[in-house]
Curated annotation (Swiss-Prot):
One term of GO molecular function: structural constituent of ribosome
SUPFAM superfamilies: Ribosomal proteins S24e, L23 and L15e (SSF54189)
A GO biological-process term: translation
Sorted UniProt keywords: Ribonucleoprotein, Ribosomal protein
GO cellular component annotations of the record: ribonucleoprotein complex; ribosome
Protein name: Small ribosomal subunit protein eS24
Family: Belongs to the eukaryotic ribosomal protein eS24 family.
InterPro entries reported for this sequence: Nucleotide-bd_a/b_plait_sf, Ribosomal_eS24, Ribosomal_eS24_CS, Ribosomal_uL23/eL15/eS24_sf
Length: 105
């Protein structure tokens, strides 16, 4: 699987970079997690800082166009992203009970 970055847009207000990328693959469309790991390796980031939003493969093609958000830190990703998107990308969600317990200690 080969990842090519098509465009990068810096979003300093949300501490992230929006990336459009293209993947050339031999078999079926790769999973979201394998794409996330490959993209993170390509840009030298931790996989918890990368949130893949969209993967689009045209029928019969061996190319996938995708959209991802790369955050400065995993905490920034947890603060900004919606819970369902964090679950799709297997990024651990901090619960409110843990937060209140940590603040009380």
């Amino acid at each position: 699987m080969e990842v090519d970055i098509l465009s990068e847009d810096e979003n300093s207000m949300l501490h992230r970079t929006d990336i459009q990328f293209e993947i050339a693959h031999e078999d079926a469309t790769p999973s979201r997690l394998s794409v996330r790991d490959s993209l993170a390796a390509k840009i030298n980031k931790d996989s918890d800082e990368v949130v893949v939003h969209k993967l689009d493969t045209k029928f019969g093609m061996r190319k996938t166009i995708g959209y991802a958000k790369v955050y400065d830190s995993p905490q920034s990703a947890r603060q900004v992203e919606q819970d369902y998107m964090l679950k799709r990308n297997k990024i651990e969600i901090e619960s409110e009970d843990e937060d209140s317990a940590a603040e009380g200690a």
